[in-house]
Swiss-Prot record:
Subunit text: Part of the 50S ribosomal subunit. Contacts protein L20.
Keywords: Ribonucleoprotein, Ribosomal protein, RNA-binding, rRNA-binding
Species in which this protein is naturally found: Shewanella frigidimarina (strain NCIMB 400)
Annotated protein name in UniProt: Large ribosomal subunit protein bL21
One Pfam short name: Ribosomal_L21p
Cross-referenced InterPro entries: bL21-like, bL21-like_sf, Ribosomal_bL21, Ribosomal_bL21_CS
Length: 103
């Protein structure tokens, strides 16, 4: 059984037991979080596709931890002007473990 749900403007395909990195959620480590924006639920031969959401669909997950991703380096450069600017960015994420999927 797997599901596709939406969180933080992104869609994630998950199954029970999977660990997923999502955009940062303001939830403490160890707590459970429910996602009700489920777009698709598949169970063997049965597939429930939402229009746009599956009615009564829910994905339950436990927060494993929070962290920051790899550094992305940004360079702004202006030719012939002796000007360059270098910046870095590390995006916050929340890691969750999927515990239940229900239609």
């Amino acid at each position: 059984m797997y599901a596709v749900f939406q969180s933080g403007g992104k869609q994630h395909r998950v199954a029970e037991g999977h660990t997923v990195r999502l955009e940062k959620l303001e939830v403490a480590t160890g707590e459970t979080v429910e996602f009700d924006q489920v777009l698709l639920i598949a169970d063997g031969e049965t597939v429930h596709v939402g229009a746009p959401l599956v009615a009564g669909g829910k994905v339950v997950a436990e927060v494993v931890g929070h962290g920051r991703g790899e550094k992305v380096t940004i360079i702004k450069f202006r030719r012939r002007k002796h000007h360059d600017k270098k910046m870095g960015h590390r995006q916050w994420f929340t890691e969750v473990k999927i515990t239940a999927i229900s239609a």
